[in-house]
Amino acid sequence: MFKLVSEFEPTGDQPQAIEKLVEGLNRGMRFQTLLGVTGSGKTFTMANVIARVNRPALVISPNKTLAAQLYQEFKTFFPENRVEFFISYYDYYQPEAYIPTKDLYIEKNADINDVIVRMRMSTLKSVRTRRDVVVVASVSCIYATGDPNDFDRMNINLAVGDRIDVLELAERLARIGYQRTEDVSLSGCFRLKGDTVEIYPTYQDEGIRIEFFGDEVDSITLIDRFNRTTLEHLDKIIIYPAVEFITTEEKLKRAVESIREELNERLSELKKQGKILEYERLKQRTLNDIELLETMGYCPGIENYSRHFDGRKPGEPPYTLLDYFDKDFIVFIDESHITVPQLRAMYNGDRSRKKNLVEYGFRLPSAYDNRPLTFEEFLKKTGQIIFVSATPGDFELSISEQVVEQIIRPTGLVDPEVEVRPTAGQVDDLVNEIVKVKERGERALVTVLTKKTAELLSEHLTELGIRSLYLHSELDAIERVEVLKKLRRGDVDVVVGVNLLREGLDLPEVSLVAIMDADVEGFLRSETTLIQIIGRTARNVNGKVIMYADRITNAMKRAIEETNRRRRIQLEYNRKHGITPRSVIKPLEIEVFEQFMVKEEPERYGDTVKNIFEMKKTLSPEEYMAVLEEEMYRAASELRYEDAAALRDELFRIREEIKKKKGL
């Protein structure tokens, strides 16, 4: 079923890791962990495991940048199988919210990326129709999507010779989300001309032409979307829905009736509680929505009524991508030390935001059920899970029936030496080290604690003739990748940033990582974070890490000890097998963003820092500070450290501005 294509055979620790993981799956182990160091080829190991067990797979990544990279790699490994991409389709997302302390209502605002919509629909179709499927997804996969049973039931099966007239087909297409139009460049539409119907699905590049002779299907052909030439003649075809959420007229009527019932119950509660303002607000808003649903079949915020459309009971989980898979699918949770906390945080973050909307009469209680899965529901809807990380968390290690280590790299590279140097004169010392790196034609990364420090240090290095750029959270993913491409090409010598882990991209040219203020305890200098930072040099034979600190914290001690443990194992393996380490040689490829026009849209669990900063224009300083503080704690709990640090810096800046205005 799966055909793995690679010019390389598994080497180093990969063969034993593959064998152990496959054996664990075959023995029915529910949870396993692949503890693989940076650069050990964890993606190749995952691909080999998938090919060996021949089962559909879902790979969950902590962010879209990493998801895009994994998607590209799996496409290379499985060119003859289906590899799909499933991330949030929002280019911009500001969720609906209410802050009662400020009496501030924030309306939902969103832009949808049509390219991602197409890729999501392709995913749903592939998962429902084939088994040789690998889906690379972000945490969006635990958010609500359409009922898979509706997706199956409402397919249109057509074969040459079938008796159906043109208008009947047009009506059926409209019922599953296709719009009639003359603009054939659009996806999810159809064109009607005489006895011919041309259909342009959202899930594939090719169009479909159905030609009729009277009320009989005369021919079915696949056509080129743009010049409309014939590509292939078919005897039969299945046309799948154009949208994720499909609503029949019967479902719509049932939903409206159910919404009315809930509204009456809730209004009765508010009246008893003496909440007159909330009573009137909810009554007016919900009746307006009902009127739109009855006349247009749609209303703004329709997703808040999803429970009524699905026929779910209060508290029942929504349908998600997980419900589309066959029951024996495997889940890989990549960078599990980040992704697992994100999966845990989604439900509570969503519910806390909606709590105010429900309590203050902006939404019915059923809005709670338009939500992501709880972590417990996620575990119930999945079967066998393999956690993948260089630094797995306590949860993964405690629940796994086996932890498989992948310490040896195929290149023979060993973990870098870690030096601790005093902070006195650290900038001058750093400059000297960067000059040495530059002379060897290599690159450096410097990680600092604040955005302001990153800017100042980068400017200082530039003044000294060292080509430097800094990474910060206000750059979107495409801009961030462009900075890293400049580093790889040699257009710049060093990149300075607050959290250089976010990308997780391969940077084989980097031989030096400098960690400034390594002894300042906090989320940016935890054991896990330090080990991940150290791993940034693990693809270069000259890799070295310098921690600037005046004391050794517990986090530093544990990170250095773990790095030295791995280094000893790697050196012994190389000595035993006569291996000479060599740097990774990796061509500068076209990035996935350029290939698929994937923009970095915020996940529904939180806005990008850029979007939050935009709110300053419409809020008072006190309101703005309340939003900053709430989002800062949320970002930190989800291990989005750079976002948390940027929000913290902005919060401090606004506080200082207020103090100055008050003359304090």
From Swiss-Prot:
SMART domains: DEXDc, HELICc
Segments forming domain Helicase C-terminal: 429-588
Domain Helicase ATP-binding, residue spans: 23-412
GO biological process: nucleotide-excision repair, DNA damage recognition; SOS response
Location of the motif Beta-hairpin: 89-112
UniProt cross-references to InterPro entries, sorted A to Z: Helicase/UvrB_N (IPR006935), Helicase_ATP-bd (IPR014001), Helicase_C-like (IPR001650), P-loop_NTPase (IPR027417), UVR_dom (IPR001943), UVR_dom_sf (IPR036876), UvrB (IPR004807), UvrB_inter (IPR041471)
Record's subcellular location: Cytoplasm
Keyword list, A-Z: ATP-binding, Cytoplasm, DNA damage, DNA excision, DNA repair, Excision nuclease, Nucleotide-binding, SOS response
GO molecular function: ATP binding; ATP hydrolysis activity; DNA binding; excinuclease ABC activity
Coiled coil regions in record: none
Domain of life where this protein originates: Bacteria
GO CC terms, sorted: cytoplasm; excinuclease repair complex
Binding site for ATP: G36, V37, T38, G39, S40, G41, K42, T43
Domain UVR intervals: 622-657
Function: The UvrABC repair system catalyzes the recognition and processing of DNA lesions. A damage recognition complex composed of 2 UvrA and 2 UvrB subunits scans DNA for abnormalities. Upon binding of the UvrA(2)B(2) complex to a putative damaged site, the DNA wraps around one UvrB monomer. DNA wrap is dependent on ATP binding by UvrB and probably causes local melting of the DNA helix, facilitating insertion of UvrB beta-hairpin between the DNA strands. Then UvrB probes one DNA strand for the presence of a lesion.
This protein's domain notes: The beta-hairpin motif is involved in DNA binding.
Subunit structure, as described in the record: Forms a heterotetramer with UvrA during the search for lesions. Interacts with UvrC in an incision complex.
Similarity section: Belongs to the UvrB family.
Designated name of the protein: UvrABC system protein B
Species of the source: Thermotoga maritima (strain ATCC 43589 / DSM 3109 / JCM 10099 / NBRC 100826 / MSB8)
Lineage of source species: Bacteria, Thermotogati, Thermotogota, Thermotogae, Thermotogales
